[in-house]
Amino acid sequence: MATRILGIDPGLRTTGFGVVECEGSRLHYIASGTVRTDALPNGDLPGRLKIIFEGVREVAARYQPDCAAVEIVFVNVNPQSTLLLGQARGAALAALVSGDLAVAEYTALQMKKAIVGHGHARKEQVQAMVARLLSLPGEPSRDAADALGLAVCHAHAGASQAAIAAVSPLARRAHAQYRKGRSY
């Protein structure tokens, strides 16, 4: 059975989205794009958050994903930028959970490592690898590529979790302890 995953790369001006379908180890591109708020004046934060909330909710309603993957906000040098990005992320998360979607969260480093092979990849490298992994005719925009990368990262994480669940109870317990930060 195929699982449809919606990836979200939150941003106050541009929020990227990407939808992939995972069937076994095969990934299929469904859609990608952006929710843009740059038509609004800079000071209209509530208006921007409303557009993000409604845009993400509309994307989820249109593509009917089974789950979502959202990028975790990193702490920037500028605390004000971090707070604003966190609010954009909150609007996207609220839209997803209002539709009863399960949401997984990944850092940019985790996503880049899953897509490119190392966590310090440049945006252009993510764009190129996403296009290659999903057999796209061209490279998606940076924000859409990051969102697709999050969806692919979640698909890979799900496959890993299923493989772990198939092994012995001791291995499952050890993995669960490892994920909680404990080791044996």
Swiss-Prot record:
One of the record's GO cellular component terms: Holliday junction resolvase complex
Organism source for this protein?
Methylibium petroleiphilum (strain ATCC BAA-1232 / LMG 22953 / PM1)
Q: Which residues form a coiled coil?
A: none
Reaction equation(s) it catalyzes: Endonucleolytic cleavage at a junction such as a reciprocal single-stranded crossover between two homologous DNA duplexes (Holliday junction)
Mark the transmembrane ranges: none
- Output this protein's name: Crossover junction endodeoxyribonuclease RuvC
- Pfam annotation, one family: RuvC
SUPFAM superfamilies membership = Ribonuclease H-like
Q: Which family does it belong to?
A: Belongs to the RuvC family.
Q: What is its main location?
A: cytoplasm
Per UniProt, the cofactor note for this protein states: Binds 2 Mg(2+) ion per subunit.
Q: Name one GO biological process term.
A: DNA repair
Q: Which domain of life is it from?
A: Bacteria
User: For this protein, what is the EC number?
Assistant: 3.1.21.10
Annotated GO molecular function terms are: crossover junction DNA endonuclease activity; DNA binding; magnesium ion binding
